[in-house]
Amino acid sequence: MHYEQGSYGIKGWGKHGPLTNPYAFGWFEHMRHEGDNKRFPQAFTIYEGGLLGSAYEGRIIAPNALHNLVYVSERLPDGSTFRTKDEEQLITTTDRWFRPVWAGVGPDGGFYMADWYDTRLSHVSPVDDWHKTSGRIYRVRPASGAPKLKPFDLSKASGEELLGYLSHQNEWFRKQAIHEIAWRNMTDLVPKLKAMPLTLETLWALDALNAVEALPINHSDPYIRRWAWKMAGEKQILPPLGEEKHIEVCAQILASAKKLPSAGALFLLRAGDIEDESGHLPLLAWWALEAKAEKERDTVFKYFKADPAFLQTKLFRDHLAEKLAKRYALAGGEENLNSCADLLALTNDETLRGKFIAGIASAFEGAEMPKLPDSLTKALNDYMAKQSGGDLTLALRSGNADALKKALKLLGDAKATNIARIAIAKTLAELGKQEAVMPMVAILKATNPPSLKRGILQAAAKFDDKRIPEALLLGWEGQIAGDKALREDALRVLAGRKEWAQILVSFVNDWKVPVKHFTIDIVRQLSLHKDADIDAAIEKHWRGLLVTGPTPEKKKEAERIKAVIKTGLGDVAKGKIQFMARCAICHKLFDEGGQIGPDLTGYDRANPDFWLDNMFTPSLEIREGFGAYIVKTKGGQILTGLMDAQDANGIVIKDMANNKTAVKQADIEKMEASPISLMPEGLTAGMSDADLKDFFAYLMRK
């Protein structure tokens, strides 16, 4: 991950929570990479030691403790950020205890590693069985011999010696010299520093002595210019923008613009109006503008009026306009909603006004719009009147009665596209329009494509209306059960409400819905209602299915399987078939499979215990970020699944079928982490010894 100042990066929402800014409206993804995808380094350093030669100079050296190796990667420009490309690995070993967890460069130029050296590397398990006496430190040096380094003490070095170290081939000396100059406040070196050719090191030394008089924003070296703009943000100095075109410098200008007061900093947003294939510049520009949108509102609008050409830039039209309108609308309140109207008043350009309108509309997804200022209501109505056929979704959210009639007609129109019918059903459900239930039920009862029914089903689930479970269950064999995905979606929806679940188990008890149609996650969802009739049905039809944790029987079977695979592994191609059938709906391996659970490629796959422990007792150690959540809504639904997204306005829960359900924060009655893994136990059930050998051959493939 490349973190610019003031940026936001992708993270595991379930593990780390939402972004700290609810108006960030985006984040940086991980840097692109070419090479080994088993990425799990615990540490890295960019080597500038001068000892190991050109093959390593400037390279990223990153230990991978989980896979007992050390990567070497080239760092390459990628728009305003970077990408990496793997080269020959520095170290590989078959010793599975080799666990390098720290990396650095020493004063001799050698590459140093701290090796944890242990049988496992996990912070999830609280079991204290670490091997505490075997850690070690390694140094990597040229094969020709150890580097010759005379004893030294930088704390006693003279000023002239420290100045000399600023151009040392080893970055360690360059940085330590700057620290010494700063710690000893060697202001007598300022004239000599100013007389030296300007480098990053001399600039840093001058800055450490508070002796930079003019920021070198026009220097020929773009990295000196970039650092100068960083200093501008930190020192609250506003230099002129000039004609800067170097994309990395532009990124820093935008990062500094976020820190600087808007009176002059808004003009710096133009630094983002250049092509950037990484997509970072538009986000940096947005974060800079958003920081001032409310706190310095008057200055923002004065700038827009004083520089109307900025509103016509690609940056503003494609990346800022919609976000800014959404930000004001989402914040709410009279002043912010008036700012939405003020945005519309800035221009007569219908395309740009459409961007503003789209931003306002997106702020109210999932709910009707509040009472808006008259000026904004008029602007919205004028916009909708000019649209061909009207903007139906926007009209619905604004409370337009005629729009409701049109929406219901579209929902029931068999000639309309499935996409349009599902989209309008979703909007009607979010708005709680009870009139939509009957046409939804009609779709579920009739012969329609499973894809349409699945989309309608997710919308219908929001309504607490008994017509929905009746339609599903009375037409189970003829309209639902034939398609596996639709069938399981229907069962999850039925299991989500207590009253519906009671009706469902009555059909199971009467053998009208087959027991075999239920997956373990659906049975577990039923159990969350804590209802005597439902619990009795679970005990009758799925006794023992929900038992978790280690048992003597599980341990015995795991040992048996381990003995089987010790005799030799089987056919990788056949093992892949087993994986795709049993695991791929949730897990990715070798770039194939689902994304509900973690990507397995980077784990300790050569270790049979890793696989067997997780297969037989998956709830014993649930990987952070992949734990399930149980959400009870104020509308009576119980949802279970992974946290797919989270912000200040609500969450998105992803179930085992990859269906995503958005729940607004105000609609959540209770949310808690589940102690039970989504992963079912008994994945190896029904496998012959030959199947097991094939299966593990694929799982443990190098």
Q: Predicted regions span which residues?
A:
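C-terminal capping alpha-helices of c-type cytochrome domains
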Residues: 202, 529-530, 540-552, 560, ...
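Beta-propeller domains with acidic blade repeats across secreted/periplasmic ectodomains
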Residues: 1-161, 180, 591, 665-666, ...
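Sequence context surrounding c-type heme c attachment/ligation sites in exported
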Residues: 112-114, 546-547, 552, 569-584, ...
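Short beta-alpha junctions and helix-cap segments that line functional grooves
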Residues: 57, 122-126, 472, 597-599, ...
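Sec/Tat-exported extracytoplasmic proteins
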Residues: 48, 141, 364, 582, ...
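C-type cytochrome heme c attachment motif
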Residues: 135-136, 205, 439, 577-591, ...
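Long, ordered, helix-rich scaffold segments
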Residues: 114, 128, 132-133, 140-578, ...
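Inter-heme linker and motif-flanking segments adjacent to c-type heme-binding CXXCH motifs
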Residues: 121, 221-227, 234-235, 585, ...
